[in-house]
Amino acid sequence: MSKRIAGPEIERLIQLLARVPGLGPRSARRAALHLIKKKEALLVPLGGAMQEAAEKVRICSCCGNVDTSDPCTICTDERRDPATLIVVEDVSDLWALERADTMNVRYHVLGGRLSPLDGIGPDDLNIKGLVERVASGAIKEVILAVNATVEGQTTAHYITDQLSNFDVRVTRLAHGVPVGGELDYLDEGTLAAALRARTTL
């Protein structure tokens, strides 16, 4: 049994921080110490912000995004193209695409990807909601922005099959050489995908 070096409140803070993705036990200890040292500037405001988020954050009933309103800010933005829908696995993917700031469209968050080995099937994802949105007739293109993994490919094929009876164009993100990437450092799968997705100049 390891020795306790701080009171239970600090230990609990460290344990909770260690559950945050990207923070292990050591990083959590460092973060906790930093927060405690900057109590008035960081710890107190962070605690307040977290409490407020816990009370106000909602899952958008339309697209699955997280926001403080339902429907979310993106779904209620009338400047966005209602005919184009980007399908993503998780909210983090939606936020990444928004940071790219290339398309002013709406989204649909699946809440994961199909993974039979992990027991995740179609009923565990928000695929039914996607089909219902497409069935409304307002959407003309569905862009599948799922990850280039085996599970992502499986999810994309399943969704394409589910939407095959609708008058909607289903596309997917091109995969290949990243901007600034050097060919020598890329794996064979990435190079093969880049060659298949080549474009005319």
Swiss-Prot record:
Zn-finger region bounds: C4-type: 60-75
Species lineage: Bacteria, Pseudomonadati, Pseudomonadota, Alphaproteobacteria, Hyphomicrobiales
UniProt function note: May play a role in DNA repair. It seems to be involved in an RecBC-independent recombinational process of DNA repair. It may act with RecF and RecO.
SMART domains in alphabetical order: TOPRIM
S-S pairs: none
Residues in Toprim domain copies: 83-178
Designated name of the protein: Recombination protein RecR
Family, as annotated: Belongs to the RecR family.
One Pfam family linked to the record: RecR_HhH
GO molecular function: DNA binding; zinc ion binding
GO biological process, one term: DNA repair
Matches recorded under CDD domains: TOPRIM_recR (cd01025)
Signal peptide: none
PROSITE patterns in alphabetical order: RECR (PS01300), TOPRIM (PS50880)
Keywords: DNA damage, DNA recombination, DNA repair, Metal-binding, Zinc, Zinc-finger
